[in-house]
Amino acid sequence: MRLMLLGGPGAGKGTQASLLINRYKIPQISTGDMLRAAIAKGTPLGLSAQKIMESGGLVSDDIIIGLVKERLKNPDCDRGFLFDGFPRTLVQAEALKDAEIHLDHVIEIAVDDEEIIERISGRRIHQPSGRVYHVVNQPPKNPGVDDITGEPLIQRDDDKEETIRKRLQVYHSQTAPLVQYYKEWAETGSKEAPKFHTISGTGTVEQIFDNIVTILET
């Protein structure tokens, strides 16, 4: 089972990815994790990436694809894998295709921007414990304070509306075109093309997961 999840920030990809890797016993392949592991091991690609990162540059798509190919040779990928945060751009998607790294399913978790903003901007954190609340979906007993300690809750900078809107802009300009790319490729009927599905990201975690599993196992 070789999978990719697409969707904006806050669409629930991370939650669903955790459930999927447990169900299908496949690893979650993250470019960040791969970079850190390659640098720690001192592999040639890792050393190349380290030099670029230390000079403040962006690691090239060639290096990223090389790391992906290395990672997929590991025995834990024999049953498949789930890509996390990769590819991010059309250039990376084309490079993945050229490298003959095949996917079985690409699933878009679709959530409206305003719903995403409400989800993320409503989060409140009790910093010392890490307890998370939501002003609408999971409010504290008393507004603005932790249920257990009575200490104030904070809103992280990453959860502020202005920051979320900027992240959504980046998503729509760079990553959202992947939806069209994989949709159009699937419509060609090519044997190499993964199956493409769009599901609603609105509902309970369990409902969304059940919808994904139905798609994968039908």
Swiss-Prot record:
Binding residues annotated for ATP, in chain numbering: 10-15, 123, 132-133, 203
Superkingdom, natural source: Bacteria
UniProt cross-references to InterPro entries, sorted A to Z: Adenyl_kin_sub, Adenylat/UMP-CMP_kin, Adenylat_kinase_CS, Adenylate_kinase_lid-dom, P-loop_NTPase
Location of the region described as LID in the Swiss-Prot/TrEMBL record: 122-159
Binding site for AMP: 31, 36, 57-59, 85-88, 92, 156, 167
Gene Ontology MF terms: adenylate kinase activity; ATP binding
Record-level GO BP terms: AMP salvage
Residue stretches spanning the membrane: none
Reactions catalysed: AMP + ATP = 2 ADP
Chain spans, region NMP: 30-59
Annotated metabolic or biological route of this protein: Purine metabolism; AMP biosynthesis via salvage pathway; AMP from ADP: step 1/1
Keyword annotations of the record: ATP-binding, Cytoplasm, Kinase, Nucleotide biosynthesis, Nucleotide-binding, Transferase
Pfam families named in the record: ADK (PF00406), ADK_lid (PF05191)
EC number: 2.7.4.3
Cell compartment(s), UniProt: Cytoplasm
Signal peptide: none
GO (cellular component) term, any one: cytoplasm
Predominant place of localization: cytoplasm
Swiss-Prot/TrEMBL domain comment: Consists of three domains, a large central CORE domain and two small peripheral domains, NMPbind and LID, which undergo movements during catalysis. The LID domain closes over the site of phosphoryl transfer upon ATP binding. Assembling and dissambling the active center during each catalytic cycle provides an effective means to prevent ATP hydrolysis.
Similarity comment text for this entry: Belongs to the adenylate kinase family.
Subunit structure: Monomer.
Purpose of the protein: Catalyzes the reversible transfer of the terminal phosphate group between ATP and AMP. Plays an important role in cellular energy homeostasis and in adenine nucleotide metabolism.
Name the UniProt record assigns to this protein: Adenylate kinase
Lineage start: Bacteria, Pseudomonadati, Pseudomonadota, Gammaproteobacteria, Legionellales
